[in-house]
Amino acid sequence: MIEKGFIVVGGGLAGLTAALSLAHKGKDVLLIEKNERCGGLMNSFWRDGFRFEGGARALVNAGLVGPLIKEFGLALEVLPNPITLGIEDKALVIEGEKSLPDYAKLLKGLYPESEAEVDALIGAIRSVIDDMKVLYGVDNPLFAKKKNVLTLAPSVVAWTFKFFRTMYRIAKMDTPFEEALDALSSNQALKDIIGQHFFRKTPVFFALSYFALYGDYVYPKGGVGAFIESLAGEITRRGGQIRYETELVRVDASNKTLTDASGESYRYGSLIWAADLKALYRAADASGLPEKAQAELATRKEAVLSHTGAESVFSVFAAAELPPEPFKKAGSGHVFYTPERAGLGKIHTDELKALMSRWDSVTKDELYAWLRRFCRYNTF
């Protein structure tokens, strides 16, 4: 049996950060990852001489990525990743909050009948951005390079106070963004342009604050995967261990042991599960727990396993043997583009439900006709 003071399960960004933080402090830590490499949704891959981003296309600093790189001394160069919003033949390169007036002008040009509603939406975006600045606009002092307790304490206290005050306000804005947009505008096309690239029922505080995040995007030189490789390499350099292609099938909390698919056992002092939550509950063995704890686990397990993802992401990777100049004319390196100002309307809601309700009788032509309209009016 392998014994470790700390075991982190899941080699995504959360697991890597947790394991590196522990290794940085000299702790005996093992990171277990079921795939052949770490990263999860943060990965890069090569195909025919082109590098593609397999998951997230860039990083959002959010006051964390930059300080993390400095804290752990990662040998990684991070580049600005400006965002372009494109609608039909119009494009706007976002330069943070100061681009809001230009964004309002763009929307009013597209929807002249809804100028007052555009103003209301921009006002709501400004209000949420002000609340979110403490989370995304300031470096977290806990990642300060030199942690002198006396000098760090005032900034931590001030940041913590702002953080909890902001979280309180955010809790009041936890409703789906669709409801908030409905209250601000009756123009479905306008609402679609602002919100249709978010997952259904995304909290309004996140959706409306996203404009501020556009200026916070960064791109690691060498790809998003280079950031992951840097984190993983630093873990092992600092004495931590990583086991790849290791899938856990049993979690025995009463005995603090894990068992993988090959039968290998691991004993831990502390466990951090940064992997799939459903996998944790499927693997959880409650037999050694008190009766009350078993009942609570069973209730929680049923609730977790009954949930499904809101939507899926379909990615198309295109390799173009062209110089950068034509792409520079069209926009920056990261673009949100909507071909038609009309937006999706009911295509992805009522029409999709109607299609699914008679799925057994839907013809191939009907399906492809719906897909063509879905792609024509969507945001990419």
Name these PLM-found stretches.
Residues 31, 242-244:
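A structural preference for short, hydrophobic beta-strand core positions in alpha/beta folds
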Residues 10, 80, 228, 244-246:
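Short loop/edge segments at beta-strand edges and connector loops
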Residues 77, 198-201, 308-312:
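A short catalytic or substrate-binding loop motif that flags glycine-/basic-rich loops and adjacent residues
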Residues 126-238, 245:
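Active-site/ligand-binding neighborhood in enzyme catalytic cores
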Residues 76-79, 110-122, 185-194, 292-295, ...:
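Short, surface-exposed acidic
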Residues 220, 249-380:
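Mid-domain catalytic core of redox enzymes
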Residues 17, 64, 102, 120, ...:
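Generic recognition of stable, solvent-exposed alpha-helical segments in well-folded globular domains
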Residues 2-137:
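N-terminal glycine-rich phosphate/pyrophosphate-binding loop and immediately adjacent elements
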